[in-house]
């Protein structure tokens, strides 16, 4: 026979479960469609997973936007499509040419001498429907003039924009977020912009993101894991707060990446671009014939000894507080490149300054980073130790493998990798 205490315990559990089931059943059923224009229901806040193992520094693949894709907003699914249409019967002219070459000059001797370039009207259509594609939530159309403040006017004029990439939904900003890539066709010259549409399809903003290809920072537009902030590569957008600018006077942004939900790594190089004694933007200039899409820019990056002594990297919170400063120089070929790896088992990011040091950044507390000079790291020799995990860092200037003790990330051994084929 069961004791009275056991009986009371079982009865209490039964009543508790019954109450929970009753509360769950009390939610009203979904209402049928009404004659009012449909709007997107409020989305539940995104919840971070308990095991935070994602690499937030990974590069975005920049795939063109979805022609017809099922997306999740809060707890509901919707169908999103993005279309780009070019109208070759509606030319758009602009001068001066700036970064655009003679391949896009207006076919007239006088216009060519004046540096006039020609593109064509484009329409960018964003359509959101319910999950089965029957009800239209919104349909929004944008055009090239909407992007005139996001990139140089001459580049916007001639661009054939790929369908904007869908980056996700930010609950805090109430926005569907898109990455837009605006470039001179058949060249490596272009800019990026971040477009925000609210749940009714209204434009919340188009934020310029700076260069996207040649001379680009190591940065892609991103939403923080919780959706509370959006990185546009020139600023951080936050709900109910002004944008947090990442730009500095007399400095070039070289990298910006989320490290965790509330913290970023931001790297600058201090100095200024100074043009040489040439005439930029002229379509009559040498090496700018009718086949040139983007003439070579003739400039130098000028920096001073005092600027070269300044800390270049910051661990920056999304509130704008600088948590840590140190010197770090990314790789640079046609664009900046953070030579890096995500050591998931140890919960740390590995950043390599070529030929100098390894910077180990704990994801949970990035301000507690530490630096390990490469010359002082012990060389890896077999056998591999019980808690060591290998992580390769390969870039234009670095080919190294680090064996990190996942229980003590300060214990690192290094191995040089053979040259690439």
Give residue spans per PLM region.
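Bacterial signal peptide processing site
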Residues: 20-24
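Bacterial N-terminal signal peptides that target proteins for export
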Residues: 1-9
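Short beta-strand elements that form the blades of beta-propeller/WD-repeat-like
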Residues: 61, 70-118, 173-186, 219-233, ...
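Bacterial N-terminal signal peptides
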Residues: 8-18
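A charged, solvent-exposed segment within the mature domains of Sec-exported extracytoplasmic proteins
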Residues: 145-226, 231, 362-364
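Surface-exposed loop/turn elements that mediate protein-protein interactions on large endomembrane-trafficking
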Residues: 127-156, 193-210, 234-250, 275-330, ...
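Repeated scaffold domains used in trafficking and secretory/extracellular systems
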Residues: 67, 153-166, 208-222, 249-262, ...
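Post-signal peptide N-terminal segment of mature Sec-exported envelope proteins
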Residues: 29-56
């Amino acid at each position: 026979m069961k004791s009275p205490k056991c009986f009371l315990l079982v009865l209490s559990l039964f009543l508790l479960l019954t109450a929970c089931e009753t509360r769950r059943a009390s939610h009203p059923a979904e209402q049928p469609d009404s004659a009012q224009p449909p709007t997107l229901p409020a989305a539940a806040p995104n919840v971070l997973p308990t095991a935070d193992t994602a690499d937030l520094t990974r590069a975005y693949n920049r795939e063109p936007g979805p022609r017809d894709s099922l997306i999740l907003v809060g707890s509901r699914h919707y169908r999103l499509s993005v279309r780009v249409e070019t109208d070759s019967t509606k030319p758009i002219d602009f001068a001066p040419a700036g970064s655009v070459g003679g391949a896009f000059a207006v076919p007239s001797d006088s216009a060519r001498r004046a540096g006039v370039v020609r593109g064509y009207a484009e329409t960018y259509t964003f359509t959101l429907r319910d999950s089965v594609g029957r009800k239209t939530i919104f349909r929004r159309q944008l055009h090239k003039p909407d992007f005139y403040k996001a990139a140089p006017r001459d580049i916007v004029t001639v661009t054939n924009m790929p369908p904007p990439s869908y980056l996700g939904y930010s609950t805090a900003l109430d926005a569907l977020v898109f990455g837009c890539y605006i470039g001179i066709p058949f060249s490596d010259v272009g800019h990026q912009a971040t477009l925000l549409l609210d749940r009714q399809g209204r434009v919340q903003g188009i934020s310029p993101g700076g260069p996207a290809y040649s001379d680009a920072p190591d940065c892609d537009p991103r939403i923080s894991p919780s959706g509370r902030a959006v990185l546009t590569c020139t600023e951080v957008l936050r709900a109910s707060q002004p944008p947090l600018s990442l730009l500095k006077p007399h400095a070039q942004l070289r990298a910006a990446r989320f490290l965790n939900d509330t913290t970023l790594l931001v790297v600058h190089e201090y100095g200024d671009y100074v043009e040489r004694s040439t005439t930029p933007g002229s379509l009559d200039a040498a090496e700018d014939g009718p086949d040139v899409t983007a003439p070579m820019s003739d400039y130098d990056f000028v920096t001073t000894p005092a600027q070269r002594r300044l800390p270049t990297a910051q661990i920056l919170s999304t509130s704008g507080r600088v948590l840590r400063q140190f010197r770090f120089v990314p790789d640079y070929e046609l664009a900046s490149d953070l030579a890096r790896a995500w050591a998931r088992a140890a919960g740390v990011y590995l950043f390599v300054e070529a030929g100098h040091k390894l910077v180990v950044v704990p994801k949970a507390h990035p301000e507690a980073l530490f630096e390990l000079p490469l010359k002082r790291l012990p060389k890896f020799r077999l056998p591999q130790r019980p808690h060591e995990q290998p992580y390769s860092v390969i870039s234009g200037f670095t080919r190294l493998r680090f064996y990190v003790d996942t229980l003590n990330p300060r214990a690192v051994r290094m191995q040089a990798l053979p040259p690439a084929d």
